[in-house]
Amino acid sequence: MGKNWKWLAKLFAFFGVCVGLFGIGTFSQVNGIASAINGFFDPDNAHCVKILPFLGEYSWSVVIASLILTVCVAAVLIGGVKRIASVSQIVVPFMAILYFAFAIILIICNITEIPAAIKVIVTAAFTPKAVTGGSMFVAMQKGVARGIFSNEAGLGSAPIAAAAAQTKEPVRQGLVSMTGTFIDTIVICTLTGLSIVLTGAWQVEGLEGVEVTTYAFQQGLPFPPAVSSFVLMLCLVFFAFTTILGWDYYSERCLEYLSGGNLKHVKVYRWIYIFAVFIGPYMTVSAVWTIADIFNGLMALPNMIALFALSGVVVRETKAFFKKQS
């Protein structure tokens, strides 16, 4: 695109730092972890404590979760304790398989309800009320927002990691990166969505975020509710923890670009990032999602401009790659 477009790269990098610090990287992840842990250990919020005068009361499980998470993240980012990150990366694939297995079991146990569930999904999306009332556009907006949160498609974050790969074929690396979007959205999100609709969890009032999935697993699986809740909590903790570390890497690279390679800024940023991890559990779910959606959109905008501008290059390189393979 040329040097005249450097401003777009800087804009992308700036919003990349914001997404890492306020969006996908910290607030939403630690808030989800704290919510899952609280749902398992203290679902009724029977044991609350007040940690600061200007804050409300929070369950002891939320407070302990925020402290442990902060210490673990600080140990990796500041203390260089890479073993924690290494263990998480080893365990996460097994957690993904376990989550997949539980979702499949739930669907099999409720297989007779699948036609009704699909009917609910389709009719809710295309009823005259949904179309004329504008709720269809709201659903589309929510779908795009949650899709970005799930697979980061169009966000521009995946190329930051892909750029570190040792490969002579950028197209091959792009194809590898695409599999993440397919697995996240087409497989995992479809299984989760079906689980929620099959068990009626989406209709239960007062449930937010991970609480909806927890309720679905508790109601739909042939295991004691405590077992289902514990497994889901464990999966979420490892998924979210590795995401926190991953987004620190993404946002650090963005900051490094903005600062011209000055690592002093990166060291300061790590402490700010750790503080964001600490305060995330004390935010409301609605605030967390709103902030994440805003910064996701802002980061995606310059990336989408670049994608459209470079689409010709992508097509040319892709054709050349497949021609070479044949």
Regions found by a protein language model. Give the residues of each.
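Membrane-interface alpha-helices at helix entry/exit sites of multi-pass transporters
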Residues: 1-11, 46-55, 167-183, 261-270
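Transmembrane-helix boundary/entry motifs in multi-pass membrane transporters
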Residues: 1-21, 213-232, 256-265
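Helix-loop-helix module between adjacent transmembrane segments
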Residues: 1-31, 35-76, 235-244
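C-terminal membrane-solvent junction of multi-pass transporters and transport-like membrane proteins
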Residues: 2-7, 233-278, 311-326
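Membrane-interface loop-to-helix entry segments
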Residues: 30-37, 60-109, 114-122, 255, ...
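Helix-loop junctions at the membrane interface of multi-pass solute transporters
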Residues: 76, 107, 147-152, 157-170, ...
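Extracellular/periplasmic helix-exit of transmembrane alpha-helices
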Residues: 102-120, 128-134, 164-167, 179, ...
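C-terminal structural cap/anchor segments
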Residues: 192-250, 257
